């Protein structure tokens, strides 16, 4: 229920901000880099790098691409997108010191997942850029035994690294299914020559 309400709010926000055009989604290009290196701007930039890669990994797909899986035991591209969507919430929640709740992305289309994931990453990047002391941030979980807080370090080797890894899987899956990512994407520069 909350997942659908959250997505609706993100969608309405995106209509107001971008005129609902896919070309106006965040991360078509990576934002300009900050003028100062701080612990927070470096992590914000890592999130931006993920957002840029995810944008292009999920741009101009076909149904065949979404259904593709390299093995019967593997996740499909669509299922991988669902997983990245969940990871994007963990990154966003950690950037705001909010508790992670299990989210169920059922009933979401690939476009819904893409939109929500990109906006989660954009929001997390913006929040991270404002953090003055990373030691104050934790990745928080609430369960039947109570709340568990882990240091922010776990965001780096956990959901952030995992989301980058799985975005690479989507790129590989697309190549294997015959619809490679746009060859003009330059992940080093964060720009795309169209």
Language-model features: locations:
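Acidic/histidine-rich alpha-helical segments that form the ligand environment
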Residues: 109-165
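Short N-terminal segments immediately surrounding and downstream of signal-peptide cleavage
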Residues: 23-42
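Bacterial Sec-dependent N-terminal signal peptides
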Residues: 1-26
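Alpha-helix boundary/capping residues
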Residues: 61, 84-87, 120, 131
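Short, contiguous alpha-helical
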Residues: 25, 44-45, 55, 65-103, ...
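Surface-exposed helix-capping loop/turn segments at secondary-structure junctions
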Residues: 60-66, 128-137, 175-181
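Stable alpha-helical elements in mature extracytoplasmic
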Residues: 39, 43-46, 50, 54-57, ...
